[in-house]
Design a protein with these regions (language model features):
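Acidic/polar, glycine-enriched structural segments that form the non-catalytic walls/loops
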Residues: 1-155
């Protein structure tokens, strides 16, 4: 938890929380909250999956960014392990679900969504991001995508 103040004096309260799912070892949930103290205007929240810091250690086999979820299937070098990361997210404004198509992001090292909302003092945006990670140590390589998506959708 922290408070951020811009050079113009606009203040936001920010909170981030990671929740591990004990009954689903491949799944975690990240919750981000941004609350306006004295700011009126647009807020953009990015929900992203990155490939990794060391681009020569991995390469993307296939990416997909859909309306409800995105996934990245990767090969890790030199270990010859494949993994699939899948992500879904929901945005709430003042505890009410925002029904809005996010802007899709698909680049070489990052995929995901950008979601913007206007806020005023007292408004709270909450982004709930679910991430599933499965690898070829536990699943057949040709079923990684299906298993990652199933982790997200069978909650």
């Amino acid at each position: 938890h922290f408070v951020a103040t811009s050079p113009k004096g606009h203040t936001l309260k920010v909170r981030a929380e990671r929740q591990l799912m004990m009954d689903a070892k491949n799944l975690m949930q990240l919750v981000y909250e941004v609350q306006s103290v004295n700011y009126t205007g647009p807020i953009t929240i990015l929900s992203l999956l990155r490939g990794g810091e060391d681009a020569d250690q991995w390469y993307s086999l296939m990416n997909h960014v859909g309306d409800d979820l995105c996934w990245r299937w990767m090969q890790l070098q030199p270990m010859n392990i494949q993994l699939c990361c899948a992500m879904s997210c929901q945005l709430k404004k003042n505890d009410k679900l925002v029904v809005q198509r996010p802007i899709k992001i698909e680049k070489q090292d990052v995929i995901g969504y950008s979601i913007a909302q206007r806020i005023k003092p007292g408004d709270k945006l909450t982004l709930c991001k679910k991430v599933a990670v499965v690898d070829s140590n536990d699943y057949a390589k040709d079923h990684l995508i299906d298993h990652a998506i199933r982790c997200l959708t069978n909650l």
